[in-house]
């Protein structure tokens, strides 16, 4: 109930008014069944604008700290994050990453629409970075379809480090569903999982038009911070020639 109130009464109408959004390919999202929406990640705003344009409820995993803070502020945070479709993930255990994967897999198996960002964190410069293989593990273990989602322009609405949201026209592109059922039973094979992840990132690259960089976004942030501190470090440019073989251009299988 809270989710739909947030979407259609409290937040949704305002977002739709201030940020007109062109939506392409929404019909690619199955009307029923467990599905993974795998998106590029440009800004915090992604998790607001994308669910707003999807008919079904979208669930995102979120750190449990958002739901356990004491006092009135904590209650408001819990209400808000529950309302926008996020569920708590306990990251305090020794195997927090596995706990997150297990929760995400369970949600898809139960027929939910799961939102996930394979890059693992926001892009520091608007480029598309190497995907983490957790998305492949979830797809294999849940047997859910993967729909690539390209967010375009949210980094201009909500730039990293900015507390303001600026009026801009946005675009959200939903790609053709990817079916990895041909790999049933191969969860845990790191080569298969990497190949599947690369196929998803390739689809995102084509859908978004972003330049692809074959390192993790978290590493890119480290390099950018080092460069800002005066250390000679540089985020690699898009490879060409033989180096381009490292770009995820071969689809799994």
Q: Where on the chain are the PLM-derived regions?
A:
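Alpha-helical membrane-targeting segments
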Residues: 1-18, 70-85, 163-169
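Short beta-strand-to-loop junctions in surface cap/lid or active-site-entrance loops
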Residues: 23-29
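Hydrophobic alpha-helical segments typical of transmembrane helices
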Residues: 9-10, 46, 76, 134, ...
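Short gly/ser/thr-rich secondary-structure transition/capping motifs
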Residues: 16-23, 96-98, 155-156
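Catalytic core of membrane glycerolipid acyltransferases/transacylases, capturing the structured
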Residues: 16, 29-94
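Non-catalytic C-terminal accessory region of glycerolipid acyltransferases
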Residues: 2, 98-253
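Generic structural signal for residues in well-ordered beta-strands
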Residues: 21-23, 86, 172
